[in-house]
Amino acid sequence: MPDIDALSRPRRLLVLSICCMSLLIVSLDVTALNVALPSLQRELGADVSGLQWTVDIYTVVLASFLLLSGSTADRVGRRRVFKTGLVLFVAGSLLCALAPSLGWLIAFRAFQAIGGSMLNPVAMSIITNTFRDPKELARAIGVWGGVVGISMALGPILGGALVASFGWRAIFWLNLPIGLAALLLTARYVPESCAAHPRRLDVVGQLLVIVLLGSLTFGIIEGGHDGWGSPLLLICFGIAIAALACLLWYEPRRREPLLELRFFRSAPFSGAFAIALAAFAGLGGFLFLNTLYLQNERGLGAFDAGLHLLPMAAMTLVFAPLSGYLVSHVGPRLPVLLSGVAITAGGVLLTGLTEDTSLAYLFTAYVTFGIGFGLVNAPITNTAVTGMPRSRSGVAAGIASTGRQVGSALGVAVVGTVLATGSRDTGWWVLAGCGVLVLVFGALTTGRWARRTAESAMARIAEEDAAEPARSAG
């Protein structure tokens, strides 16, 4: 296996292509599954809660293990963990395709998510270690972002076509050939790499994150159906609060914590995490509600429903690179504020939907929301790493990615629970509220004052890290 520094440019591009294959199957799996929800609901007799869990169990497990997978890859080898992730994801997809009931499907989705947690963050680490030249790395990340946009555009259409032709199980069958091809190519062409100073395993922190996310999501989905004051909801929220308190107490006391809470002293970093939560909660809720609206209320088939979502996905594809350009030239403030305005406006427009709403009005709402979501990703990544030293930027970006997944899970949980109470219009207002949060957090955490907090926070962290070896030696 050749050394990374000795790789030719064609070989580096091949490594990038292999990493993008993993991103493609994960992204297609998520976007295509949303279109299949009504078909799955009919065949397996699922209620709204069951549909929520089909989507959210994957996202919750993925978010819970993202940071662990990244640190494990740094320690035992990125190529090794990436291959393991592909094996688990493909095996999980096979099990999902064969699931005999809703309960088994949810369980297999959790298994699939463990593999998924080892793919995208580890693939990004492979890319950053393969492309050492800053300009080449910027172009590689641009290609990576383009694949996300392509999957969002193709996912609903491809998912709709597969469901219409072969049923919802075909979505999972599709992962097998792509995943196996990526596995074989990884074994042959991707070089191994490890971090020079890998972080230690934080078992307690990992367990607390799982308890926190699991109890919070479970409480919203299950407890919310019995009313927001139900005993189950209160118990779950109590467990979540206790887990959060333990996490806030325990993590600062570890020399190498799973969650680097000191980063939250930086206003741009805290803002990036909050914006990621809000924006992806809006996206998760948008895909969940619109799939059910188009197929159950407007009576569209799966393929037609996928086509109807194309304007939103197309705007995301178009405005994502524009956002990156704006961030590099004028900073993250303008695109994140425009994103907040567009997501809010899109959510407000969606509140007026009925089964007879004209396509012109519907597509206007979809285009507006798509513009907002297309603009938000680049500012999230940029504000997360603002002021961070290079050695810390990967950890910061990983925490921001966890925020994206947590937001998506909470978005589906909240709007699904609202929908189960018989109030779809309230669900649309939740999406508008997500846009307002993006706007507010963007305004507060992207100005000069915020940048100064990032500089002071990183200086303080550097001082603390420098003092730690001295205390240990003493």
Say what each PLM segment does.
Residues I4-R12, L98, P198-R200, D226, ...:
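Helix-boundary and loop/linker segments of multi-pass membrane transporters
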Residues P10-L13, D133, Y189-L207, G227-L233, ...:
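Short loop segments and helix-boundary regions at transmembrane helix junctions
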Residues M1-R188, A320-S323, V330-T344, V348-E355, ...:
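Transmembrane-helix bundle of Major Facilitator Superfamily
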Residues L176-A195, I210-E222, I239-R254, V438-R448:
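C-terminal membrane-cytosol helix-exit motif in multi-pass small-molecule transporters
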Residues S49-W53, G103-F111, F166-L174, R200-D202, ...:
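Interfacial loop-to-helix junctions that mark the boundaries of transmembrane helices
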Residues R12-L28, L33-V35, V48, P231-I239, ...:
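12-transmembrane solute porter fold
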Residues M1-R11, A195, T445-G474:
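Intrinsic disorder in cytosolic terminal tails and internal cytosolic loops
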Residues P191-L207, R253-L261, R451-A462:
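Flexible cytoplasmic inter-helical loops of multi-pass small-molecule transporters
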